[in-house]
Design a protein with these regions (language model features):
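Active-site helix of classical SDR
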Residues: 121, 157, 165
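Alpha-helical segment proximal to the catalytic Tyr-Lys
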Residues: 126, 170-174, 228
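Conserved glycine-rich cofactor-binding loop
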Residues: 6, 13-14
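Conserved glycine-rich Rossmann-like NAD(P)H-binding loop of the short-chain dehydrogenase/reductase
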Residues: 29-43
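C-terminal substrate-recognition "lid" of short-chain dehydrogenase/reductases
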Residues: 133, 211-237, 241-242
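Residue(s) in the substrate-gating loop at a strand-loop-helix junction
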Residues: 141
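Substrate-binding pocket helix/loop in short-chain dehydrogenase/reductase
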Residues: 97-98, 102-110, 200
Length: 243
């Protein structure tokens, strides 16, 4: 399904990013795993990915830094020869009510989640245009659609990703580059482990939290040829939360 493709995944050391990396490797893709600080976890994911018989390498990159992104992408192209798929998954939360939210927390979330997505897309764009092929998958959130309380920073950053996805899709479509977004609901990761799962389940029609593998399966579809006529779309994967 993805044999011969090279995929770049940010935030790949754990959670959704790790699941996507492993799913892509299982389907035959070579994977470049980007992480910010946890090299040990990233190395574990790399070893698991290579067990599928594909190439996997790790790269330290703070996506909020445009220079880090440019350097990482240049190194990846040097190592793999090309990039076919980019998954912008890196993200953080700093939840607080609006009246109590420090300006620093707002800026950090927007810089990592939204500016980081922009930095990575910009760093990869020339590669996609030159190759006349590309799949960009941006991880947004249902928070962008629902405006969850305590998440002014996070919701704004994820809503920005949806808008940026649409604009980039229009710009790059003539170059055979598809740009789509995934909007997960409550997924069982470190980011959601402190939440009251019983209360959350009352709001989800399918009555369960999602798994990172649920998101990875959708990402695999968007990375494959099966989605070649889909671009500029945001697909919810939330158990019906945002119906």
């Amino acid at each position: 399904m993805l044999k011969g493709r090279t995929a770049v995944i940010t935030g790949a050391s754990r959670g959704i990013g790790a699941a996507i990396a492993l799913k892509f490797a299982e389907l035959g893709a070579n994977v470049a795993l980007l992480y910010k600080s946890n090299s040990e976890k990233a190395e574990e994911v790399r070893k698991s990915a290579e067990a599928f018989g594909t190439q996997a390498k790790i790269y330290r990159c703070d996506v909020a830094s445009a220079e880090d992104c440019r350097s990482a992408i240049a190194e990846i192209i040097n190592n793999f020869g090309k990039i076919d798929i980019l998954v912008n998954n890196a993200g953080i939360t700093r939840d607080n009510i609006l009246a109590m939210m420090p300006e620093k927390d707002f800026s950090e979330v927007v810089n990592t989640n939204l500016v980081g997505c922009f930095n990575m897309m910009k760093a990869c764009t020339r590669n996609f245009i030159r190759n006349k092929y590309g799949k960009i998958i941006n991880i947004s959130s249902v928070s962008a659609l629902l405006g969850l309380a305590g998440q002014c920073n996070y919701a704004a950053s994820k809503a920005g990703i949806i808008a940026m996805t649409k604009s980039a899709a229009r710009e790059l479509s003539s170059r055979n580059v598809c740009v789509n977004a995934i909007a997960p609901g409550f997924i069982s990761t470190d980011m959601t482990k402190e939440l009251d799962s019983e209360e959350i389940l009352t709001r989800i029609p399918l009555k369960r939290l999602g798994s990172p593998e649920d998101v990875a399966n959708l990402a695999a579809f968007l990375a494959s040829g099966a989605s070649d006529y889909i671009t500029g779309e945001t697909i919810r994967i939330d158990g019906g939360l945002a119906i």
